[in-house]
Amino acid sequence: GVASGPVSFMKIFDAATEQIKQGGRRRGANMGILDATHPDILEFVDAKRDPETLRNFNLSVATDETFWTAYRSGNPFDLLNPRTDEVVATVDPDDLLDHIAEMAWETGDPGMLFLDRINEDNPTPSLGRIEATNPCGEVPLLPYEACVLGSINLGHHTDGDEIDWDALRETVHLSVRFLDNTVTMSTFPIPAIETQVQRTRKIGLGVMGFHDLLVDLAIPYTADAAIDVADELMAFIREESVAASRGLAAERGPFPAFEDSTVEVPIRNAVTTSIAPTGTISMIADCSASIEPIYNVAYTKRVLGGLEMVNDRFIDIAKDRGFYSEALLETVHGRTSIQDVDAVPDDVKRLFLTAHDVPPERHLRIQAAFQQHVDNAVSKTVNLPRSADVGAVRDIFLRARELDLKGVTVFRSGARPEQVLGEDPLKEECISECEYVGPEPG
């Protein structure tokens, strides 16, 4: 017989996930990753053209320098039998990239992963090559590894109009200890997962509330100063997380695979940092998600039953400055930009740029500023308006490669009817049962 290929088996996993919902309501999430060299790559790229297919999957195409060399040179790109490495077909890499961009434009999937960049930071190559990530792409994983994540609310780490570095240092050290304890105390569904997790003790400490922090510092998200803050901030968190993990190694011992790793100084956790999307926990913490710009000032979060969200910082500034009114709140509700709202002063508008006000280049440069100090990866979405064309998506993939990112996701507004944050919730009728299950690798 002939195997039916990866896409057919993904549909089986998707159906199983649909039946096993979290608490009977919230869907689980899967990440489907296929190497660009796979003979079924075109079928994979097209897999979510039907919006009812693979609703519990994010998709990403895995590439490395082999693909990008072929793309730059214009040479044919080989598709290989994954068992024998035999060339079974060739494609035009330019056409393949166009097709990936077209489907990402249409559906939000697939994203793009850069596996060579990911494996540059693999601390345990003796245990294998990393070929996959967790569902949102912020944790590259070896087979049977799991992600243990935590995120610091940056909005709680300011002193006036400055970052409170002492408070942040204390939070980082406590968080690393907490996450390491979590690795120890967690139970896993099968022994192989427990063995692999305990072997490397990987953790992913990240941030949320970055846009809130910028508002407190009076820095627009698109300003060069925002990139500087991202750079300095994540360098500090990285340095302190490593110091905390080394302290734990002295106290508890290094991770068991340390001797066979590329890490030179004993450390408790093979990796310590990661930027997760924080879609749910940022709601609980009442802060902006991850390192993303805000999506709206006031909007409906498209979860089961709907949830009204209002930016407290915007309300506080409006009241302090004397331009708050219920009519203003109604005006800004559900808008993807407040830049044309006359009642809002220009300097305030600049602080509350939304995801659609931020040009793709600025999305990517913020991601790059964080990524250079993150040993896992960064989950970030480059948002585009409905009017964006396929070429804009393609350009983002190319620029992400230039900026040395580990992955990138593009989402054009309206590409999926169940997106969590609707442009105009009053006009949207499709209510999702859970958060948007879309690709967010970074």
For the regions a language model picked out, list residue spans one by one.
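Active-site cavity-forming subdomains of large catalytic enzyme subunits
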Residues: 1-154, 158-159, 165, 192, ...
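Secondary-structure capping and boundary motifs in well-ordered enzyme cores
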Residues: 1-9, 33-37, 59, 92, ...
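Catalytic alpha/beta core of large soluble enzyme barrels
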Residues: 138-140, 179-184, 273-430, 435-442
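Structured alpha-helical segments in the cores of large, soluble enzyme domains
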Residues: 6-23, 61-71, 103, 138, ...
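Internal maturation/activation junctions in enzymes
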Residues: 25, 84, 171-194, 198, ...
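Long, charged, mostly alpha-helical binding arms that flank functional sites
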Residues: 144-208, 215, 327, 338-351, ...
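Short, glycine-/Ser/Thr-/acidic-enriched flexible segments
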Residues: 39-41, 49-50, 84-85, 110, ...
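Glycine- and acidic
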Residues: 1-3, 21, 25-31, 79-86, ...
